[in-house]
Design a protein with these regions (language model features):
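Short, conserved beta-strand segments within well-ordered enzyme catalytic domains
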Residues: 47, 62-64, 73-77, 103-107, ...
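Glycine-rich active-site/cofactor-binding loop and its immediate structural neighborhood
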Residues: 70-109
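Active-site loop-helix segments enriched in His/Asp/Glu that coordinate
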Residues: 82-91, 112-124, 140-141, 145
Length: 388
């Protein structure tokens, strides 16, 4: 069994074990990948202030996210195609999150369906939805989430149109994967992955096929996907979705203060400062650089979370210190899942937790809820001094 001490250990194993198209799907951004890179590198510009001769006993990372008790302020982000990284991937990730005591967020574009995950877990999970044109299908998604006892809906608002992701286009990404000479040759080298896929019936988008109008089988999925997303989305429509759902609402994809205020005004319970992991608008601010201005705009009137770029417990701790009430990991848990299945997700969470807990103690705190900006050296102009 390999010794796992950091998320990078899992990424290296993951790269060896999954087909290239699915590795590239996770480990890439849009256009030049500037934002994808800066999501991580901007965390490196924040430095910790180490304190000594401080009692470090009885450390706790326990906190809450939208009223839910969590073992640490970290949730598993919604990641599409998770069940292509590892057979029954969403179920395995949800189980690992439940056992660890952190929220799991299921993507609409998951391979395992809402019902699949609900049948294989006991803790309520969160369900992410995109803004789609078909109101009837949206209502049925909300109804299915309610029936599965999902405790919150996460609406992604930054995918009205799809970002230009060069690697996905060149790889012909799909679920199940398109069979070309190159993809077949590559998949034949991924024996563990292939055996897992042969042993499951879940190989298509489980929330879509057989549920969306005109998508009775996988052959019609590509046509539906090309037409389903709503480019005319506005805040009134988001307000309508909140009414259709009727429960706790998290809005994901906020990167500018004006939109944070709009999310507050439509009644969201929380927002996620996110640029979709650098997979939508390349050249946008990293999430951690965008965070201070958003916090200045909304204060404590709404819970502010952050995703994009978190690859360690130190990154998550820095985000919390900057003012985020919660954080999300997507790629970090995906590496673990593709590398070692459910155990790999658990390993990823253990790594994140240990890094967060020890770093917090070095900074003079034993309770995550007391952490603030005072534990950081923040460079002048970090959040930007822009003309507009």
């Amino acid at each position: 069994m390999p010794v796992i001490t950091e998320i990078e250990d899992l990424r290296r194993i993951y790269k060896r074990r999954v087909p290239k198209m699915f590795y590239d799907y996770a480990e890439s951004g849009s256009w030049t990948e500037q934002t994808f890179r800066e999501n991580s590198s901007d965390f490196d510009k924040l430095y910790f202030r180490q304190r000594v001769a401080v009692d470090m006993d009885n450390r706790s990372t326990r906190s809450t996210m939208i009223g839910r008790d969590v073992a640490m302020p970290v949730a598993l982000a919604p990641v599409g195609l998770t069940g292509m990284q590892c057979a029954d991937g969403e179920i395995k990730a949800a189980r690992a999150a439940e056992k660890f005591g952190v929220p799991f967020t299921l993507s609409t574009m998951s391979i395992c369906s809402i019902e699949d995950v609900a049948e294989n877990t006991t803790a309520p999970f969160w369900f992410q939805v995109y803004t789609l044109k078909d109101d009837d299908f949206m209502q049925r998604l909300f109804d299915r989430a309610r029936a599965a006892q999902c405790s919150a809906i996460v609406i992604t608002v930054d995918l009205q149109v799809l970002g230009q992701r060069h690697k996905d286009l060149k790889n012909g990404l799909s679920a199940p994967p398109k069979l070309t000479p190159a993809s077949i040759a590559n998949m034949m080298t991924k024996v563990r992955w292939g055996l897992g896929m042969l042993g499951t019936k879940r190989r298509f988008f489980g929330n879509i096929v057989g549920h969306a109008e005109g998508v009775e089988d996988p052959s019609s999925l590509s046509t539906w996907t090309a037409q389903a997303f709503d480019p005319s989305l506005d805040w009134d429509r988001i307000r309508q979705f909140k009414k259709m759902w009727g429960g706790p609402l998290i809005i994901k994809g906020i990167i500018e203060p004006e939109d944070a205020i709009q999310a507050l005004n439509v009644g969201a319970d929380a927002i996620i400062v996110s640029n979709h992991g650098g997979r939508q608008l390349d050249g946008a601010l990293s999430s951690v650089r965008a965070l201070p201005a958003i916090l200045d705009a909304v204060g404590d009137k709404i819970e502010v979370h952050l995703d994009s770029g978190i690859r360690s417990g130190q990154d998550a701790l820095k985000a919390v210190a900057m003012g985020a009430k919660g954080t999300y990991i997507g790629r970090a848990f995906t590496y673990g899942l593709g590398a070692m299945g459910e155990e790999g997700v658990t390993r990823a969470l253990e790594v994140i937790h240990k890094e967060m807990e020890i770093s917090m103690a070095f900074c003079g705190h034993t309770d995550i809820n007391t952490v603030d900006r005072s534990i950081l050296h923040i460079p002048k102009g970090f959040s930007g001094d822009w003309e507009t």
